[in-house]
């Protein structure tokens, strides 16, 4: 509640107090409530915390609405600005995210979470070098952030610096042992380097850490096992290995049909070699029939 403060109006002229003339028409002096900026900022932070909780429950639209109001109340609070920027990034509005996060960074230049968010924004903008710069700055202040190490690994992968990418993915797992996306992406790098068996081993490890349910490592294992079994040849198509690979891959596609979209796979950093193998898998008659239904 805003506090209502009484206001005494006096008009001073040459040291004299001039009384109003009741017999004459006179404009009323407007009564203006003074703004309590400290209270507004406090209310903005409270709304931002509510928005953060909604985002954690994946209620992003409601979170975005609250965060927008929070910024109106606390326009100079770095954390509030960063929250709204992060929600815009989640919504794919990268330019709005960049504007807010840049402003937040100017207010709190050493805050690692803001630097991480700027790195993620530049990743989406495909400015991988800038992304790596922000992520490295943030990691100097918070070196064991598994998500940021994962993002930095992705930036290095997209810069074709594979050894650096694997090093950051391994650091991510060292920081958080069950961080399966980093293990999954080590598999992506290894496969592009021609190490198919080692890649499959990483995907199997990632799948186990994810409780056996994540479609991405499941599909990757399937398409590579299908290729290794030479399952396109009619003589091999009925083999146990080929049937297991087909079943696993089709289950993954049924779990999440986005993985049937080659553009989506590329966005998830599936490289040229793995995409070629996947296209062969998608050409199998049973898979083609499934794709037509998805």
Can you annotate each of these PLM segments?
Residues 44, 78-79, 112-113, 146-147, ...:
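Helix-start (N-cap) detector for alpha-helical repeat units in TPR-like alpha-solenoids
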Residues 140-193:
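Ligand/cofactor pocket segment of small-molecule handling proteins
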Residues 2-79, 90, 281-282, 287-294:
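N-terminal leader/linker segments that initiate helical-solenoid repeat arrays
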Residues 73, 107-108, 141, 175-176, ...:
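Structural marker of alpha-solenoid helical repeat scaffolds
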Residues 57-65, 90-103, 125-137, 158-171, ...:
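Structural signature of tandem alpha-helical TPR/SEL1-like repeats
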Residues 26-35, 231-244, 248-294:
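Terminal, low-structured helical/coil segments at or just beyond the last alpha-helical repeat
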């Amino acid at each position: 509640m805003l506090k209502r403060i009484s206001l005494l109006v006096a008009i001073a002229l040459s040291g004299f107090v001039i009384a109003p003339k009741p017999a004459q028409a006179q404009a009323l002096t407007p009564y203006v409530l003074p703004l309590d900026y400290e209270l507004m900022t406090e209310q903005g932070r409270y709304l931002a915390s509510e928005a953060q909780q909604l985002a954690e429950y994946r209620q992003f639209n409601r979170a975005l609405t609250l965060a927008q109001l929070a910024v109106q109340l606390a326009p100079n609070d770095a954390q509030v600005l960063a929250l709204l920027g992060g929600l815009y990034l989640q919504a794919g509005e990268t330019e709005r995210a960049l504007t807010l996060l840049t402003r937040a960074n100017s207010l709190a230049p050493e805050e690692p979470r803001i630097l991480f968010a700027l790195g993620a924004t530049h990743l989406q903008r495909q400015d991988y070098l800038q992304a790596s710069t922000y992520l490295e700055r943030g990691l100097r202040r918070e070196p064991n952030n598994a998500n940021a190490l994962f993002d930095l690994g992705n930036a290095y992968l997209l810069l074709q610096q594979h050894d650096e990418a694997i090093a950051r993915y391994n650091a991510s797992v060292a920081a958080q042992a069950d961080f399966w996306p980093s293990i999954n992406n080590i598999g992506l790098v290894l496969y592009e380097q021609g190490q198919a068996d080692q890649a499959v081993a990483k995907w199997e490890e990632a799948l186990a850490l994810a409780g056996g349910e994540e479609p991405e490592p499941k599909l990757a294992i399937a398409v590579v096992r299908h290729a290794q079994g030479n399952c396109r040849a009619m003589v091999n198509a009925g083999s146990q290995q080929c049937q297991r690979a087909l079943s696993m891959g089709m289950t993954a596609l049924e779990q999440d049909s986005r993985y049937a979209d080659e553009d989506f796979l590329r966005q998830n950093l599936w490289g040229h070699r793995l995409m070629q193998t996947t296209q062969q898998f998608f050409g199998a008659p049973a898979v083609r029939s499934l794709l037509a239904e998805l």
